[in-house]
Amino acid sequence: MATVNQLVRKPRAPKVDKTNVPALDACPQKRGVCTRVYTTTPKKPNSALRKVARVRLTNGFEVTSYIGGEGHNLQEHSVILIRGGRVKDLPGVRYHTVRGALDCAGVSERRQGRSKYGAKRPKS
């Protein structure tokens, strides 16, 4: 236990909590411009071509964002919205692209879990 004099000389430092999504600046989403859209391969033991985009955010950060769902319409200079959420088998990918927002179209023909992919309700 510290004495009063010790605390006067050097006060207690507040706890600093580390964030998993530093580029969001404590915001729920951020807007950015795609600088590169490409596919990459996951870690062992998985095998696929995962679609990702390199994004320059409005706050100056440059991050890699995963593009979920089947098919997408993104290309260089597309303006997209990103949210937090890492992809476990892609090292360095800590953000997800929000489908159906800004320049990113929703997943067409999506029937279940539509809200996560920006898909409208089908006409019965």
UniProtKB/Swiss-Prot annotation:
Any one GO CC term of the record: small ribosomal subunit
GO biological processes: translation
GO molecular-function terms, A-Z: rRNA binding; structural constituent of ribosome; tRNA binding
One Pfam family hit: Ribosom_S12_S23
Sites bearing 3-methylthioaspartic acid, chain numbering: 89
Keyword annotations of the record: Methylation, Ribonucleoprotein, Ribosomal protein, RNA-binding, rRNA-binding, tRNA-binding
Stored InterPro entries: NA-bd_OB-fold (IPR012340), Ribosomal_uS12 (IPR006032), Ribosomal_uS12_bac (IPR005679)
Keyword Ribonucleoprotein: yes
PANTHER family: 30S RIBOSOMAL PROTEIN S12 FAMILY MEMBER
Family label: Belongs to the universal ribosomal protein uS12 family.
Function text: With S4 and S5 plays an important role in translational accuracy.
Quaternary structure, from the entry: Part of the 30S ribosomal subunit. Contacts proteins S8 and S17. May interact with IF1 in the 30S initiation complex.
Protein name, per record: Small ribosomal subunit protein uS12
